[in-house]
UniProtKB/Swiss-Prot annotation:
GO terms, biological process: translation
Annotated InterPro entries: Ribosomal_bS6, Ribosomal_bS6_sf, Ribosomal_S6_plastid/chlpt, Transl_elong_EF1B/ribsomal_bS6
Function of the molecule: Binds together with bS18 to 16S ribosomal RNA.
Annotated GO MF terms: small ribosomal subunit rRNA binding; structural constituent of ribosome
Record-given protein name: Small ribosomal subunit protein bS6
Residues annotated as signal peptide: none
Length: 96
């Protein structure tokens, strides 16, 4: 299994419950696809350097997980079609 890291920007106008629901959705998706969640780190609301989809702020969260490439691909696919996600980046961590 490979290690991956995803940084996700969520719409800033969500309620706390809805935000937690979005995070849980992706945290639960990883094991469903045969992966393993290593760490979830909520960074909170931060100001963006430039507007993204007409938003100047976003909630950030970091998701570290292990899995096959298909797990990362499915996570990216679901993030692309989610209206609550304004930007994301999934990268494979280097082996050390």
């Amino acid at each position: 299994m490979r290690e991956y890291e995803a940084v996700v920007l969520v719409r800033p106008n969500l309620e706390e419950e809805a935000l937690q629901g979005v995070i849980d959705k992706f945290v639960n998706l990883v094991p469903q696809q045969g992966g393993e969640v290593v760490k979830v780190d909520k960074w909170g609301k931060r100001r963006l350097q430039y507007e993204v989809k007409k938003f100047k702020e976003a909630f950030y969260f970091l998701l570290n997980f292990k899995g096959e490439p298909a797990v990362a691909q499915e996570l990216e696919r679901v993030m692309k079609i989610s209206d609550d996600i304004i930007r994301f980046l999934v990268v494979r961590k280097d082996e050390q």
